[in-house]
């Protein structure tokens, strides 16, 4: 259930981010390199499955549901509404220790625009949890921690297959989710770089898209309803995330 489609040559050279359109659902690909720390480092990110099974954490004790709590939803309702999709079908399935997004948004400079993980309470940079005397939550450090944001879409697809995760949700837990340059508004540019396609995109959206492309970082270009299909850009390439027919959590 994986296909890579290379766009046909355009009459004029397309921008680097428009050269490849890959369709990602599930399948086996490259394994990712994982940064390591000493086992006795209290700031080492902990395995997600183990914090729930052995360390007494409950999903929502950390930032698992911050994406919706930030909107003003009360904690008990957030746990009730999102427990299956986000807790059981995502966090509790990850038998690894990657840092994940605090929220599904793109607000550079805001504290919640970072990635996080559970750590031992002794970690000096961790914040304490009201419901656990053993754990803390910390903001991850680029270059030091195993961050989903550093992985390629192909590596994320491998992770989705290995841990039986929704690839759509995994992408949104890895990359900032762009709110202005949304996929329905810009999709035509990646399939057809003609003047007609270009003219269909308003100037501010086009400028925003060009800026995101120039960074080389990964971003989710979300759909209007927040579900697949949507786009991902990273490193000069564009990926189409389609509804996962193998793991129907989209």
Pin down the residues of each PLM region.
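Low-complexity, disordered terminal segments
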Residues: 1-9
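Low-complexity, Pro/Ser/Thr-rich intrinsically disordered segments
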Residues: 9, 13, 30-38
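Cleavable N-terminal signal peptides of Sec/SRP-targeted secreted and luminal proteins
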Residues: 19-33
